Amino acid sequence: MDAERLIALEAQFAPAVEQGRGVFSPKDKSHHAPYNLGGDKMAADRNGYAHVYAALLQDLNPQMVVELGVFRGASLALWCELFPEAMVVGLDLDFDRFRENEPNLRDRGAFTVNFPLLHEWDAYGDDVEFLADLPGIDLFVDDGPHRADAIANTVRLVGPLMNPGGVYVVEDFPGGGDILAGAFPQAQVIYAGGLSAARL
């Protein structure tokens, strides 16, 4: 996996815009201000995760990719492009921003070979039935509420559904690695600023 390709794909699908979110979990106590986002994962002037993702995905050929926190859908477009044979699933409480942005993503070349399955899911809830009915997860990306309680709850629910050799990523929360290390004591845990990952 090439970091420059990750940066280029994200830039293709996600120009920066300021956008508020519409729906929050009633248990989410985080700040609800608008986000100035396009794609914020890969580019060095944003979160700069491209090199970490390139290393994490180097030997991974996922058949099941799940991302929590869809927002405008740029990451889903990225995963669908990178893994055209994989089932890509997006979890969120609100898909309105994604649906509004989907034509823009398609105009930019997204979803020509793969389209994600969308499912309403609350990171603070306890519903795992939908995920348990899917094949095991090879790549899980938690880009959800960015709060310790939500991350710990999601790890508790999703962890048992991960395939051996899979990668579990927590974005934009510096304490994510400690949560992952506690949940997966045998895993190699990577700490990279705001991104943490467990290679199972």
Across the structure, where does each feature detected by a protein language model lie?
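A short alpha-helical cap/connector motif
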Residues: M1-L200
